[in-house]
Structure formats: structure tokens, C-alpha cells
């Protein structure tokens, strides 16, 4: 409940000698709070009128009528702004290159026809390339498109900011098949941007084969190659391990699609019959 504050001045009819109040006067009565600061009153006559300090009254309320939560934005309505990608009126060209909702190229159509087709399909007409000649537009469910875009963006941010640690365990005498399975898993984890910890557990008398386990880990690191770089290792305790960190530069090159080969123009082949006919002429 908002508080009500009021300041009231009044004239008091005082009688008697000088009276000094050395401390503030406060009173609460049925939610009414009275506060009178320190003051002195001198009466010169039994019915002398003397101006008294003002009394500040406050009823109810919290902290001055303000919000209980200073930074609270609840209840604010977000202003919706029209996306430029939907502003078809901004296209000055009379024709556009239209793509349907299945990403099939329809071709050149008038701007009015593109709008009509989108309305008939109950879809949005979105501008993909406003600077192209003619501009490229596409029919789609724009809200769904934006949702998927934001979802992909969040997933990419998680991959760039978060790096999980994946563990791969194997024995010093692991067979080739199991070794290959762990190698493929390590490559996949590194390409996904995660660290890989390769562990070889030495139990009991297996500690005698420590050198074999160390050679196994070094071989594993060598076969990973530039895809992962060594972050840390431990070849002293019973649990031998090596931690590999993804090499982002190498992974980026691996994930890039290979460049398309340019088709060589077919050489004009002249048949022997044509050569013979030319010579006869």
C-alpha cells in the first residue's frame, strides 16, 4: 500500500514558563505516525500564540511509495520492432527472385505476385538478399525460422565457451579392435571441441609392464596427430594418463568443406569423318 504523507502547521495556545523538549517526539496511533523534532517554546503570556514546528504525518505504505524491487522490470511491456527482413515495401525493384518454403527456386516474379503467393500459403515473405539484383525473397514461417536460428546460436556459444573432459580407459594389453574404437572416439571428441583424457590403469603386478603402457599412450598421441595437443600427463602413478586438448585451427580446416573443382571446358573434338570431308572439299 502506498503511504500518505502530510505536513501540518498549527498555532498552539501555550501557558506557563519556558519549556524545552530535548529529544524528538514520536507517536504511533492506529498506523498514524507523528514525528516532531527537537524544539523550544517560550511563552510570554498565558495566551500568547507561538508558532510550533510542523508535524509530519505518515500513514501506511512501504518505502516512500516506490517499488519494493528497485530493479524490478516485471510488468514492463517489451516494445516489438518490425524486422527489416519482413519489410517488403523497402524493395524498390518491381521483380524479385522467389524461393518457396521447400527452398526450391521458383524464379523471377513480380513483387505483388510474391506477396500473393506467400499469403495464399499462409507464410511470411522474408528478404534474404536485399542488395541482390533482383532481390532474393523466400516464403517461410519466420517465427519458426528465428527460433531455430537462436537455438543454433546458443549451441555454438556453448561449444565455444564450454569444454568437457571425456575419458577413455584401456589396458596396457588392449587388442587392436578396441584400440581402434577408442581412437575413433577420441577423434570425434576433439572435433566436437572437448578434451580427451586417455587412461591406462595398472593393477597389481601389471606395474611391471609400465613401459609398455607408456609406449601405448605415446603411440595414441602420435596417431591423433595435430588434431590434439598435449595439455598434461602422468607417467608416475599406477593410473597413467595423458590429456589432449583440441587444436582449434586444425579442426577448423578439417571441418571446412573441400573446394569445388572447376569443370574444365570440354575440348571441341573433331571427328575423323569431318576431317576427311573437309579435306575432300
Curated annotation (Swiss-Prot):
GO cellular component terms listed in the entry, alphabetical order: chloroplast; plasma membrane
Biased composition (Basic and acidic residues): 70-79, 253-270
Entry GO MF terms: mRNA binding; translation initiation factor activity
Localisation: Plastid, Chloroplast
Span of chain positions assigned to the transit peptide in the UniProt entry: 1-51
Free-text disruption phenotype from the record: No visible phenotype under normal growth conditions.
Superkingdom in the source lineage: Eukaryota
Alphabetical list of Pfam families matching this protein: IF3_C, IF3_N
UniProt KW Chloroplast keyword: yes
Claim: Ubl conjugation is one of the keywords in the record: no
Annotated spans, Disordered: 63-86, 253-281
Keywords on record: Chloroplast, Initiation factor, Plastid, Protein biosynthesis, Transit peptide
InterPro entries: T_IF-3_C_sf, T_IF-3_N_sf, Translation_initiation_fac3_CS, Translation_initiation_fac_3, Translation_initiation_fac_3_C, Translation_initiation_fac_3_N
Primary role: Chloroplast translation initiation factor that is essential for the coordination of leaf and chloroplast development. IF-3 binds to the 30S ribosomal subunit and shifts the equilibrium between 70S ribosomes and their 50S and 30S subunits in favor of the free subunits, thus enhancing the availability of 30S subunits on which protein synthesis initiation begins.
Subunit structure: Monomer.
HAMAP family: IF_3
Family: Belongs to the IF-3 family.
Name of the molecule in the record: Translation initiation factor IF3-4, chloroplastic
Amino acid at each position: 500500500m502506498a503511504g500518505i504523507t502530510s505536513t501540518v502547521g498549527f498555532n498552539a495556545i501555550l501557558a506557563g514558563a519556558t519549556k524545552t523538549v530535548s529529544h524528538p517526539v514520536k507517536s504511533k496511533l492506529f498506523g498514524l505516525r507523528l514525528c516532531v523534532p527537537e524544539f523550544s517554546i517560550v511563552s510570554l503570556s498565558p495566551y500568547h500564540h507561538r508558532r510550533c514546528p510542523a508535524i509530519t504525518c505518515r500513514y501506511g505504505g512501504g518505502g516512500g511509495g516506490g517499488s519494493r524491487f528497485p530493479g524490478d522490470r516485471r510488468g514492463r511491456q517489451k516494445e516489438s520492432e518490425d524486422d527489416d527482413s519482413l519489410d517488403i515495401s523497402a524493395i524498390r525493384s518491381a521483380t524479385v527472385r522467389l524461393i518457396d518454403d521447400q527452398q526450391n527456386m521458383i524464379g523471377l516474379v513480380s513483387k505483388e505476385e510474391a506477396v500473393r503467393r506467400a499469403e495464399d500459403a499462409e507464410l511470411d515473405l522474408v528478404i534474404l538478399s536485399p542488395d541482390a539484383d533482383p532481390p532474393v525473397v523466400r516464403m517461410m514461417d519466420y517465427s519458426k525460422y528465428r527460433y531455430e536460428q537462436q537455438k543454433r546460436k546458443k549451441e555454438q556459444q556453448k561449444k565455444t565457451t564450454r569444454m568437457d573432459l571425456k575419458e577413455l580407459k584401456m589396458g596396457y594389453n588392449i587388442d587392436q579392435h578396441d584400440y581402434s574404437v577408442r581412437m575413433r572416439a577420441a577423434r570425434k571428441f576433439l572435433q566436437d571441441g572437448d578434451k580427451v583424457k586417455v587412461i591406462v590403469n595398472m593393477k597389481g603386478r601389471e606395474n611391471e609392464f609400465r613401459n609398455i603402457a607408456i609406449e601405448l599412450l605415446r603411440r595414441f598421441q602420435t596417431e591423433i596427430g595435430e588434431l590434439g595437443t598435449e595439455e598434461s600427463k602422468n607417467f608416475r602413478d599406477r593410473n597413467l594418463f595423458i590429456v589432449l586438448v583440441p587444436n582449434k585451427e586444425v579442426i577448423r580446416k578439417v571441418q571446412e568443406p573441400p573446394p569445388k573443382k572447376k569443370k574444365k571446358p570440354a575440348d571441341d573434338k573433331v571427328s575423323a569423318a569431318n576431317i576427311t570431308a573437309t579435306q575432300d572439299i
